[in-house]
Protein backbone atom coordinates (compact mmCIF):
# COMPACT_ATOMS: atom_id res chain seq x y z
CA UNK A 1 0.00 0.00 0.00
CA UNK A 2 1.42 3.39 -1.02
CA UNK A 3 1.85 6.04 1.71
CA UNK A 4 -1.09 8.45 1.84
CA UNK A 5 1.04 11.52 2.46
CA UNK A 6 2.84 13.17 -0.48
CA UNK A 7 6.65 13.18 -0.49
CA UNK A 8 8.75 16.33 -0.19
CA UNK A 9 12.49 15.91 -0.76
CA UNK A 10 14.91 18.09 1.23
CA UNK A 11 18.64 18.64 0.64
CA UNK A 12 20.56 20.50 3.35
CA UNK A 13 24.21 21.31 3.92
CA UNK A 14 26.50 24.17 4.90
CA UNK A 15 27.43 26.95 2.53
CA UNK A 16 29.77 26.00 -0.35
CA UNK A 17 29.14 22.28 0.13
CA UNK A 18 27.95 21.83 -3.46
CA UNK A 19 24.19 21.76 -2.86
CA UNK A 20 23.34 23.66 -6.04
CA UNK A 21 25.25 21.38 -8.40
CA UNK A 22 24.03 18.18 -6.74
CA UNK A 23 20.46 19.47 -6.60
CA UNK A 24 20.45 20.20 -10.33
CA UNK A 25 21.74 16.71 -11.11
CA UNK A 26 19.06 15.19 -8.88
CA UNK A 27 16.35 17.40 -10.40
CA UNK A 28 17.39 16.41 -13.93
CA UNK A 29 17.37 12.72 -13.07
CA UNK A 30 13.90 12.79 -11.52
CA UNK A 31 12.49 15.58 -13.72
CA UNK A 32 11.52 17.73 -10.74
CA UNK A 33 11.80 21.41 -9.83
CA UNK A 34 13.89 23.08 -7.11
CA UNK A 35 12.58 25.28 -4.30
CA UNK A 36 15.50 27.38 -3.03
CA UNK A 37 15.45 27.84 0.75
CA UNK A 38 17.95 30.64 1.24
CA UNK A 39 17.46 33.79 3.31
CA UNK A 40 19.31 35.99 0.77
CA UNK A 41 18.68 34.37 -2.61
CA UNK A 42 15.02 35.32 -2.29
CA UNK A 43 16.09 38.91 -3.08
CA UNK A 44 16.53 40.33 -6.56
CA UNK A 45 19.90 41.74 -7.73
CA UNK A 46 21.86 39.79 -5.11
CA UNK A 47 23.35 37.11 -7.33
CA UNK A 48 27.13 36.83 -7.02
CA UNK A 49 27.36 37.52 -3.29
CA UNK A 50 24.74 34.87 -2.49
CA UNK A 51 26.10 32.26 -4.95
CA UNK A 52 22.66 32.18 -6.54
CA UNK A 53 22.15 29.51 -9.23
CA UNK A 54 23.29 30.97 -12.54
CA UNK A 55 20.89 31.89 -15.34
CA UNK A 56 22.12 28.81 -17.24
CA UNK A 57 21.34 26.60 -14.24
CA UNK A 58 17.94 28.23 -13.79
CA UNK A 59 17.13 27.64 -17.45
CA UNK A 60 18.12 23.99 -17.14
CA UNK A 61 15.91 23.42 -14.08
CA UNK A 62 12.98 25.50 -12.90
CA UNK A 63 13.80 27.21 -9.57
CA UNK A 64 11.24 28.67 -7.17
CA UNK A 65 11.78 31.14 -4.29
CA UNK A 66 14.53 33.04 -6.13
CA UNK A 67 14.26 36.76 -7.00
CA UNK A 68 10.92 37.04 -5.20
CA UNK A 69 11.42 40.29 -3.28
CA UNK A 70 13.16 43.63 -3.55
CA UNK A 71 16.23 44.03 -1.27
CA UNK A 72 14.49 46.89 0.53
CA UNK A 73 11.74 44.52 1.74
CA UNK A 74 12.60 42.43 4.81
CA UNK A 75 11.42 38.82 4.63
CA UNK A 76 11.49 37.00 7.97
CA UNK A 77 11.29 33.24 8.57
CA UNK A 78 7.52 33.25 9.06
CA UNK A 79 6.93 35.17 5.83
CA UNK A 80 9.36 32.91 3.99
CA UNK A 81 7.48 29.89 5.28
CA UNK A 82 4.19 31.25 3.95
CA UNK A 83 5.66 32.00 0.52
CA UNK A 84 7.38 28.61 0.33
CA UNK A 85 4.36 26.61 1.51
CA UNK A 86 2.20 28.14 -1.23
CA UNK A 87 4.84 27.24 -3.80
CA UNK A 88 5.13 23.67 -2.49
CA UNK A 89 1.37 23.11 -2.32
CA UNK A 90 1.03 24.40 -5.88
CA UNK A 91 3.38 21.64 -7.03
CA UNK A 92 1.70 18.99 -4.89
CA UNK A 93 -1.66 19.93 -6.41
CA UNK A 94 -0.10 19.23 -9.80
CA UNK A 95 0.98 15.76 -8.57
CA UNK A 96 4.66 16.76 -8.60
CA UNK A 97 7.36 16.08 -6.00
CA UNK A 98 8.72 19.33 -4.49
CA UNK A 99 12.48 19.45 -3.91
CA UNK A 100 13.69 21.87 -1.21
CA UNK A 101 17.37 22.86 -1.25
CA UNK A 102 19.16 25.20 1.14
CA UNK A 103 21.46 25.98 4.02
CA UNK A 104 19.24 28.36 5.99
CA UNK A 105 18.37 26.02 8.87
CA UNK A 106 15.72 28.12 10.56
CA UNK A 107 13.97 28.86 7.27
CA UNK A 108 14.08 25.21 6.20
CA UNK A 109 12.70 23.97 9.51
CA UNK A 110 9.99 26.61 9.50
CA UNK A 111 8.74 24.96 6.31
CA UNK A 112 9.15 21.26 7.04
CA UNK A 113 8.34 21.30 10.76
CA UNK A 114 5.87 24.15 11.06
CA UNK A 115 6.74 27.48 12.58
CA UNK A 116 5.29 29.37 15.53
CA UNK A 117 6.72 32.87 15.52
CA UNK A 118 6.80 34.91 18.74
CA UNK A 119 3.85 37.28 18.79
CA UNK A 120 6.01 40.34 19.38
CA UNK A 121 5.36 43.41 17.23
CA UNK A 122 8.30 45.70 16.40
CA UNK A 123 9.41 47.76 19.41
CA UNK A 124 10.61 51.10 18.03
CA UNK A 125 12.18 52.35 21.27
CA UNK A 126 13.99 49.09 21.99
CA UNK A 127 15.28 48.87 18.43
CA UNK A 128 16.61 52.42 18.52
CA UNK A 129 18.46 51.66 21.76
CA UNK A 130 20.00 48.50 20.33
CA UNK A 131 21.04 50.35 17.18
CA UNK A 132 22.81 52.95 19.33
CA UNK A 133 24.72 50.19 21.11
CA UNK A 134 26.08 48.92 17.81
CA UNK A 135 26.16 45.43 16.35
CA UNK A 136 29.23 44.23 18.26
CA UNK A 137 27.70 44.92 21.69
CA UNK A 138 24.29 43.63 20.60
CA UNK A 139 25.88 40.37 19.47
CA UNK A 140 27.57 39.95 22.86
CA UNK A 141 24.23 40.58 24.57
CA UNK A 142 22.52 38.00 22.37
CA UNK A 143 25.21 35.43 23.21
CA UNK A 144 24.20 35.83 26.85
CA UNK A 145 20.41 36.03 26.32
CA UNK A 146 20.04 33.42 23.59
CA UNK A 147 23.28 31.54 22.80
CA UNK A 148 21.42 28.97 20.67
CA UNK A 149 20.17 31.69 18.33
CA UNK A 150 23.71 32.96 17.71
CA UNK A 151 24.56 29.54 16.25
CA UNK A 152 22.03 30.01 13.48
CA UNK A 153 22.68 33.56 12.28
CA UNK A 154 25.63 35.53 10.97
CA UNK A 155 27.19 37.70 13.68
CA UNK A 156 27.09 40.69 11.29
CA UNK A 157 23.33 40.29 10.76
CA UNK A 158 22.02 43.28 12.67
CA UNK A 159 18.37 42.69 11.78
CA UNK A 160 18.18 39.18 13.25
CA UNK A 161 20.41 40.07 16.19
CA UNK A 162 18.14 42.92 17.22
CA UNK A 163 15.04 40.81 16.63
CA UNK A 164 16.40 38.12 18.94
CA UNK A 165 17.09 40.69 21.65
CA UNK A 166 13.71 42.32 21.10
CA UNK A 167 11.84 39.03 21.59
CA UNK A 168 13.84 38.21 24.72
CA UNK A 169 13.41 41.64 26.33
CA UNK A 170 9.66 41.72 25.64
CA UNK A 171 8.74 38.12 26.51
CA UNK A 172 11.60 37.00 28.74
CA UNK A 173 11.85 33.91 26.51
CA UNK A 174 14.56 32.95 24.07
CA UNK A 175 13.64 33.19 20.41
CA UNK A 176 15.50 29.92 19.78
CA UNK A 177 13.03 28.14 22.04
CA UNK A 178 10.11 29.15 19.83
CA UNK A 179 8.01 26.11 19.18
CA UNK A 180 7.64 24.33 15.90
CA UNK A 181 4.07 23.14 15.66
CA UNK A 182 1.45 22.06 13.15
CA UNK A 183 3.90 20.27 10.84
CA UNK A 184 2.66 20.09 7.24
CA UNK A 185 0.94 16.89 6.03
CA UNK A 186 3.92 15.68 4.01
CA UNK A 187 6.41 12.84 4.16
CA UNK A 188 9.87 14.36 4.39
CA UNK A 189 12.98 12.74 2.95
CA UNK A 190 15.84 14.78 4.38
CA UNK A 191 19.25 14.34 2.75
CA UNK A 192 22.46 16.09 3.81
CA UNK A 193 25.91 16.94 2.46
CA UNK A 194 28.88 17.14 4.82
CA UNK A 195 32.07 17.81 2.83
CA UNK A 196 35.47 17.07 4.34
CA UNK A 197 37.11 19.70 2.10
CA UNK A 198 34.71 22.50 3.03
CA UNK A 199 37.35 25.09 3.97
CA UNK A 200 39.08 24.76 0.60
CA UNK A 201 35.74 25.02 -1.21
CA UNK A 202 34.82 28.16 0.75
CA UNK A 203 38.14 29.83 -0.10
CA UNK A 204 37.80 28.99 -3.79
CA UNK A 205 34.21 30.24 -3.97
CA UNK A 206 35.07 33.45 -2.13
CA UNK A 207 38.00 34.13 -4.46
CA UNK A 208 35.77 33.56 -7.49
CA UNK A 209 33.13 35.83 -5.98
CA UNK A 210 35.53 38.77 -5.89
CA UNK A 211 37.03 37.95 -9.27
CA UNK A 212 33.68 37.71 -11.01
CA UNK A 213 31.89 40.81 -9.83
CA UNK A 214 30.69 41.10 -6.23
CA UNK A 215 32.23 44.57 -5.98
CA UNK A 216 30.38 45.78 -9.07
CA UNK A 217 27.20 44.09 -7.85
CA UNK A 218 27.57 45.85 -4.48
CA UNK A 219 28.09 49.21 -6.22
CA UNK A 220 24.86 48.70 -8.17
CA UNK A 221 22.93 47.84 -5.00
CA UNK A 222 24.35 50.91 -3.22
CA UNK A 223 23.38 53.13 -6.16
CA UNK A 224 19.83 51.80 -6.07
CA UNK A 225 19.18 51.36 -2.34
CA UNK A 226 21.90 53.26 -0.49
CA UNK A 227 24.89 52.05 1.49
CA UNK A 228 22.87 51.58 4.71
CA UNK A 229 20.77 48.73 3.29
CA UNK A 230 20.84 46.03 6.03
CA UNK A 231 21.57 43.25 3.52
CA UNK A 232 24.85 45.00 2.71
CA UNK A 233 25.99 44.15 6.25
CA UNK A 234 25.89 40.41 5.50
CA UNK A 235 28.93 38.29 4.65
CA UNK A 236 30.61 39.18 1.39
CA UNK A 237 28.68 42.38 0.73
CA UNK A 238 30.04 44.08 3.84
CA UNK A 239 33.60 43.28 2.77
CA UNK A 240 32.91 44.38 -0.81
CA UNK A 241 31.46 47.64 0.51
CA UNK A 242 34.64 48.21 2.51
CA UNK A 243 36.72 47.64 -0.63
CA UNK A 244 34.63 50.31 -2.37
CA UNK A 245 35.23 52.65 0.59
CA UNK A 246 38.96 51.77 0.38
CA UNK A 247 38.92 50.45 3.94
CA UNK A 248 40.06 47.02 2.72
CA UNK A 249 42.13 45.70 -0.16
CA UNK A 250 40.61 42.96 -2.29
CA UNK A 251 43.04 40.45 -0.77
CA UNK A 252 42.01 41.48 2.76
CA UNK A 253 38.34 41.28 1.79
CA UNK A 254 38.78 37.76 0.43
CA UNK A 255 40.57 36.65 3.59
CA UNK A 256 37.99 38.22 5.91
CA UNK A 257 35.03 36.88 3.92
CA UNK A 258 36.57 33.40 3.90
CA UNK A 259 37.09 33.47 7.68
CA UNK A 260 33.53 34.65 8.35
CA UNK A 261 32.07 32.09 5.96
CA UNK A 262 33.98 29.24 7.61
CA UNK A 263 32.65 30.37 11.00
CA UNK A 264 29.13 30.56 9.59
CA UNK A 265 29.45 27.08 8.05
CA UNK A 266 30.42 25.70 11.47
CA UNK A 267 27.26 27.18 12.96
CA UNK A 268 25.20 25.70 10.12
CA UNK A 269 26.66 22.25 10.75
CA UNK A 270 25.88 22.56 14.47
CA UNK A 271 22.30 23.52 13.67
CA UNK A 272 21.79 20.64 11.25
CA UNK A 273 23.30 18.17 13.70
CA UNK A 274 21.07 19.33 16.57
CA UNK A 275 17.85 20.32 14.80
CA UNK A 276 17.54 18.06 11.76
CA UNK A 277 17.25 14.35 11.07
CA UNK A 278 19.06 14.17 7.76
CA UNK A 279 20.39 11.05 6.09
CA UNK A 280 23.96 12.08 5.32
CA UNK A 281 25.03 11.19 1.80
CA UNK A 282 28.18 9.27 0.91
CA UNK A 283 30.79 11.85 -0.16
CA UNK A 284 32.39 9.39 -2.59
CA UNK A 285 29.28 9.31 -4.78
CA UNK A 286 26.73 11.89 -3.70
CA UNK A 287 24.46 11.63 -6.74
CA UNK A 288 24.28 7.83 -6.78
CA UNK A 289 23.56 7.70 -3.06
CA UNK A 290 20.89 10.40 -3.35
CA UNK A 291 19.18 8.62 -6.26
CA UNK A 292 19.04 5.32 -4.34
CA UNK A 293 17.49 6.96 -1.28
CA UNK A 294 14.98 9.02 -3.27
CA UNK A 295 13.88 6.04 -5.39
CA UNK A 296 13.33 4.01 -2.22
CA UNK A 297 11.22 6.82 -0.69
CA UNK A 298 9.19 7.20 -3.88
CA UNK A 299 8.45 3.49 -3.81
Swiss-Prot record:
Gene3D superfamilies: 1.10.20.140, P-loop containing nucleotide triphosphate hydrolases
Chain spans, region Interaction with substrate tRNA: 38-41
Pfam families assigned to the protein according to its UniProt record, in alphabetical order: IPPT
Single GO MF annotation: ATP binding
Reaction catalyzed: adenosine(37) in tRNA + dimethylallyl diphosphate = N(6)-dimethylallyladenosine(37) in tRNA + diphosphate
InterPro entries (UniProt xref): Dimethylallyltransferase, IPT, P-loop_NTPase
Swiss-Prot/TrEMBL site (Interaction with substrate tRNA) positions: 104
Binding site for ATP: 13-20
Positions of substrate binding: 15-20
Swiss-Prot/TrEMBL cofactor(s): Mg(2+)
EC number(s) per entry: 2.5.1.75
GO terms, biological process: tRNA modification
Top-rank EC class of the record's enzyme: transferase
SUPFAM superfamilies on file: P-loop containing nucleoside triphosphate hydrolases (SSF52540)
Alphabetic keyword roster: ATP-binding, Magnesium, Nucleotide-binding, Transferase, tRNA processing
UniProt record similarity statement: Belongs to the IPP transferase family.
Function: Catalyzes the transfer of a dimethylallyl group onto the adenine at position 37 in tRNAs that read codons beginning with uridine, leading to the formation of N6-(dimethylallyl)adenosine (i(6)A).
Subunit annotation: Monomer.
Protein name (Swiss-Prot/TrEMBL): tRNA dimethylallyltransferase
Provenance organism: Prochlorococcus marinus (strain MIT 9515)
Name of the gene encoding the protein in the UniProt record: miaA
